[in-house]
Amino acid sequence: YKKDAKKEGFVYIQEKISLDDTITASQLYTLAGKMGARLLSSHLDAILNQNLLPEPQDEEETVYCQLLSKIDALLNSQTMTAQQAEQQIRAYEIFPKTKIEISGFLCIINEANVVDAKATPLDIEFKDSKYLRIKKLTALSGKQMNADSFINGYLK
């Protein structure tokens, strides 16, 4: 979705944030918040003195993310790759939280990684024949636990 620069306002200063394959939504928010505070404090005088003037956003560079719903949180191993699932877990860490059904239990996945071979009951195969290895999850009880605790408490 494209933003409407007229609705979104102007930009005084910006920096790019480099993302790696491990950053979570909360880490990105923290990083962006610190960067925003640093940029504002270092440029506020120039803005107030009109030495730094606003510029319209570049229409080619601006994108808008649609609002997420709880329906977006469900993983589908038939339509997603394991990498897409792992990325969704990190992106939806705060809301709507990524969910999957495991042996009849709807669980929130808190941490996982992609592996090539199945080694535990919590290694879920995806459409690319790779597996999502669930490391931490929240069960219906609301308690976050590691994979072994879930296996011992729910699958045995």
Show which residues each predicted segment covers.
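Donor/substrate-binding cores of folate-linked one-carbon enzymes
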Residues: 1-64
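Short secondary-structure boundary/capping segments
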Residues: 2-4, 65-67, 99, 123-124
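Short, conserved beta-strand edge motifs with alternating hydrophobic and charged residues
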Residues: 14, 56, 76, 99-101
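Short amphipathic alpha-helical segments
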Residues: 15, 71-73, 130-132
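Generic anion/oxyanion-binding catalytic loop in active/binding sites
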Residues: 17, 29, 73-74, 139
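Amphipathic alpha-helical surface "interface" segments used
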Residues: 59-69, 106-110
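Acyl-group handling in specialized metabolite and lipid biosynthesis
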Residues: 67-80
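An anion-binding loop in the catalytic cleft
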Residues: 78-156
